[in-house]
């Protein structure tokens, strides 16, 4: 059986590495992380879309995580889980418009991450 693939879109390198380690140890195939929405979209044009995207809401660059998630969902119908360090009601309302599979608050706890990923992939 092939491991399900996950793309991490996170502009903080240490957080991306932490997520990669947790997910790889749980048996998921983690694609090389990208640090911006633009990178994520370019990456997805070149490869088979992953089974899941973990996306930081606040990314550097011209596309924030919410707009990037909107484009990913429209093009590829891939489930997205948002990562956030903030609970700003305006940002959360915007994020809800793209129907994410969940939100994980930073700092990310292993149990919380794996529960959200499992739910997004298997209902």
Which residues make up each language-model segment?
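Conserved acidic carboxylate
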Residues: 10
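Two-component/phosphorelay signaling modules centered on CheY-like receiver
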Residues: 13-32, 37
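Acidic, metal-coordinating helix/loop segments flanking the phosphotransfer/catalytic sites
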Residues: 20, 33-52
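Active-site residues of response regulator receiver
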Residues: 56-57, 84
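Short amphipathic alpha-helix used as the core "switch/output" element in two-component signaling
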Residues: 64-78
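A short, hydrophobic beta-strand element within the central beta-sheet of small alpha/beta folds
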Residues: 77-87
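Alpha4 helix (beta4-alpha4-beta5 surface) of REC/receiver domains from two-component response regulators
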Residues: 87-105
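C-terminal output helix
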Residues: 90, 108-118
